[in-house]
Amino acid sequence: MQVNNTNETKQRRLLIENAAQILTMRGESNHDVGMVENGWLYIEGDRIKAVGSQEEVERAAGDLEGVERLDAAGKVITPGFVDCHTHVVFGGSRVAEYAVKLTDPRPETLKKLGIPTGIYASVNMTRDTSVERLAARTERRMRNMLVTGTTTIESKSGYGFTLPAEMKMLEVNRLLSATLPMDIVPTFLGAHGWAEGKSKEWYIDQLCQEMIPQVAAFHMASFNDVWVDEGNYTSAEAERILTCGVDHGLIPSIHADCYSDIGATALAAQMKMANAGHLNYTPLSVMPKLRDAGVVGVILPGTDFAVKHPHVANARPMLDCGMTMALATNCNPGCWMESMQVVLTLACRQNGFSPAEAFRAATYGGARALTLDDRGVLDVDKVADLLILDVETFEDVIYKFGRNHVQTVIKKGKVVARDGRILESEPS
């Protein structure tokens, strides 16, 4: 992940005044956003040093001479969004497939028209894209994510199915971590499918004997992910792949129950995985097990919308049973969504979240899904990743949908974007 200049952050002091609302996320439950009204917030370097009333913050800050000040009067402050499930590194576009499917989703129609579809279409386009071009196109997407409020993003491989192609995708994450003012958490998703013309058994051997050891040896990923579903990997196969990852120091996560329940979430609970994503067909009986195992449930409203899912994920019973929940864009060629603000709106309209629960899932929950306890909450000594939203109340982001409500993005104590623009030279 990107590391800011230490000397610069030590010298920086920032006081944000007069916010109508500060959502600290210091609460204990899914619906508690830790609201502070008429709030102030003080930052030293890259860390928050005080949050609360004017009197509390000024007392904690001490001498304020020379401190940079931002007036947030009538505005809302929240933690930066943590987009904890994306496939943002990819080549090409599947717009032709998407456009046809809007009115005629039959596979035979797409085949007759000669339109490549699905993951394997993206695999071929990504393989054919140079690392430089792949980085440039991904950077454009990540910049859009940053100005709409995402300060930490998880980014998966999974459109390669060979070691060089998967490593190329992970190298893009490394390159962009050095140039963008956001943290990129890399995930190895070699088990997104398997190489065409090869058996699944052969490919699993390649994953465990060559690909995972190499990814780990070169420190290219923090997480190891598998897509478990009918027609893809079984729970037993996923257990082997994820256990191999654990043996090489990679944290397990899983694509679970998107189109069927074949034991993926039960495995997530058994292995105490960091997170499980999709959850469209997760049985009620497994939800308490996920909660007790500390598995964060990741709901992907954009995907449910983009594919017109026949069984939209219902987060309500998960929230009610006390699972920690997260929201993410799942940005990918089949769900090209870059804004977490749109995710918030969809989550509340179609997936059973209240506005408070959605904001908490998009910040605190996303950080927990990535095992990051230093962000997603505005509290003393936490990383100063936060947003100033040009709204009177946080619910307005969900209510007044369709535009960017982020006025200011602060990353590690530094203003990095304002009014839809990153405060540095734009890419050529």
Predicted regions and their residues:
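Metal-associated gating/positioning segment near the N- to mid-region
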Residues: 69-137
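N-terminal metal-binding scaffold of metallo-dependent hydrolase/deaminase domains
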Residues: 1-60, 396
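Divalent metal-coordination and catalytic microenvironments
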Residues: 19, 41, 46, 74, ...
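Metal-coordinating catalytic core of metallo-dependent amide/deamination hydrolases
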Residues: 120-139, 143, 151-262, 333
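Short peripheral tails and domain-boundary helices/loops at the edges of structured domains
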Residues: 406-422
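Non-catalytic positions within long, well-ordered alpha-helices that form the structural scaffold/packing
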Residues: 146, 208, 216-217, 246, ...
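Conserved beta-strand scaffold positions in the cores of enzyme catalytic domains, especially
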Residues: 15, 66-71, 186, 409
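Active-site-adjacent C-terminal substructures of enzyme catalytic domains
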Residues: 251-252, 261-377, 389-391, 395, ...
